Amino acid sequence: MNILFTGASSFTGYWFVTKLAEAGHEVRTTFTRDSAEAYGDDVRGQRVRRVAERSKPLFSCPFGSAPFLEYLKNERVDLLCHHAADVTDYKSPAFDICSAVANNTRGVQEVLKLLSRNSKAALLLTGSVFEGGEGAGSEGLPAFSPYGVSKAATADICAYYCRAAGVPLGKFVIPNPFGPWEDARFTGYLMRAWSNGDVANIRTPAYVRDNIHASLLALAYVAFAEALPATNDGFRRTNPSGYVECQGAFAGRLAQEMRLRTGWECRFECARQTEFDEPRIRINTDPVNGVALGWDEAVAWNKLAQWYTP
């Protein structure tokens, strides 16, 4: 397929583009900045440079912008993968929901009008398990944050205009991915602590979450993407699921796998969690069959260890 992909500088975007390209698809990636060098030398910049080698990059080309629309006017696109989202201060209570939604959906009507010229084209939107109503869990499935609200609103807007334009829509809902090329989050904290010989302190061990290898998530994304243009029911959704367990148990799983591969002690302590600012349970609902996708769990653990081994 000829694929146009937004949001390729992100951790999951990098993995999705990599696996789409490996599957033989022609991928055009769009970036908001004017060059790969403009993303710097941190892990995000490294991802951008690697993505640029695996795809055909379009710089200074945000979703819905004039260059973006011009590309759609002149090129045949079979699948538009809208993975980009405004994540500015996404963990902050002051996150600007309205601004984020506007950025995420700018020009969406014109985008879909141009996309619909190919009668077999589809839109694949990335969602988050942190949106209100997504996945399964506790407390009535509220949004985790203003960012989660913005993602749900983005999905609603895209669904409305896809119906109006007659463009099939797929929603791929992401849980908690981890793996090589990740940003500094929970898994990264544990791995850095253990590589330094420190005892990791887990402050929220009681939260039940859905952690999944990025390599497995990406294969699930490719399978979903390949099936989407052939859909005739207008809308499809998948909520891929990995390791469903409390964060303390996931830390134990990670520690066991890394002890086998690194020689580190991988010590950690779980605090007694008394505050629950987020829903206690939030998980996805569609377990991914890695064997059917040709995925090797042991290899995935090996590559994670290699990524963090000096």
Q: Which residues fall in each region the model found?
A:
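NAD(P)H-binding glycine-rich loop region in Rossmannoid oxidoreductase-like domains
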Residues: 56-103
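Active-site helix of classical SDR
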Residues: 146, 150-153
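NAD(P)-dependent short-chain dehydrogenase/reductase
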Residues: 159-210, 214-222, 254-255
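Mid/C-terminal beta-alpha module of Rossmann-like enzyme folds, strongest
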Residues: 190, 196, 220, 227-275
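Conserved C-terminal active-site "lid" loop/helix of NAD(P)H-dependent oxidoreductases
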Residues: 214, 248, 269-303
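Glycine-rich Rossmann NAD(P)(H)-binding loop
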Residues: 6, 174-180, 201-212, 233-246, ...
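Conserved Rossmann-fold NAD(P)-dependent oxidoreductase catalytic core, especially the SDR/UDP-sugar
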Residues: 80-82, 106-146
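N-terminal Rossmann/SDR dinucleotide-binding element
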Residues: 1-76
